Amino acid sequence: MEKHTIDPMVSAEHLAGAVRFATVSNADNSLTDYTKFDAFHEYLKETYPLVHKHLALEHTDQAGLLFHWKGTGKSGAAPLLLMAHQDVVPEGDPEKWTYPPYSGT
């Protein structure tokens, strides 16, 4: 796999783009708007094409994503697990925010 330089400003733009999705979950799954998660998944696919090209993607439930990065088995390195979550809590009272929720500011 070729090496890439990480630009901190581009990384910040990617993060700001990611937090613009109101991926609010609910204990009652019927109240969760999964179209927001679908849009977020599309954003990830467009923003990180190499991840989607080189890693195997498994959808674990209505919104869960599991990426499998297969090693060569030659290095003897221990397995590595990276985890994150996509859901957020409801924004509450927007008047209490310095910047609008989901603005990516």
Region locations from a protein language model:
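Short secondary-structure boundary micro-motifs
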Residues: 1-2, 7-9, 41, 51-52, ...
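N-terminal hydrophobic or amphipathic helices/low-complexity stretches enriched
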Residues: 1-31, 35, 92-96
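Non-transmembrane, interaction-prone segments in cytosolic or luminal domains
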Residues: 3, 7, 66-69, 80
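Active-site-proximal helix/loop capping residues that flank conserved catalytic or ligand/cofactor
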Residues: 13-16, 42, 80
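A non-catalytic alpha/beta surface segment that caps or lines the substrate-entry region
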Residues: 20-77, 101-104
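Active-site metal-coordination/substrate-binding segment of hydrolases
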Residues: 77-105
